[in-house]
Amino acid sequence: MAQAPKKATAKKTAAKTLNFHQQLVTNQWLLNFFNPNTLTGLKERLEHAKFEGIDEDGQTKFFHELCNSLFNKHLVDENTLRRYDLNIVKHWQQITERRNYHEGITLHLKYFQYLSLLVAEIYLDWYFAKTEDMLLGLNQQLALFNQEQSLDQQFELYSQDDLNKVAYWSATGRGK
């Protein structure tokens, strides 16, 4: 990950207070894969129950909605997104198979569960298959972040060794 903030050589300036989400450079980089590139915007588009479930073609309904302009096709093409989605479906079905059978229901992914799994797919794919592109993208995002910071709040660029360290946090917002 980005290294500790650099020491300021000049007199400290009043640092602008950032909220937790503004400081998550990796999160900001991953949000660039989506249109809109905010969690609030994605929630507004995907939270509806009509997008839950799997279509006849084996893809999630979220996948079809993402293909309708919610995904940045300059970063990931539709076939790659399709592969991510099919992997999510495969794992979700394995995870829920016994519970679905015993309870006589079919559990469907909620939008926040789906997005969590999708960003994990993206991160892992880029980490293993597109390492240099990932490093470049993260450092571009970090440069944008650093432009808004005082010198003592800036972070050093990522190195390839930093990419295998990632914190994963997912919350439903329901206080559980």
Task: Annotate each predicted stretch with a short phrase.
Residues 175-176:
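Conserved glycine(s) of the Walker
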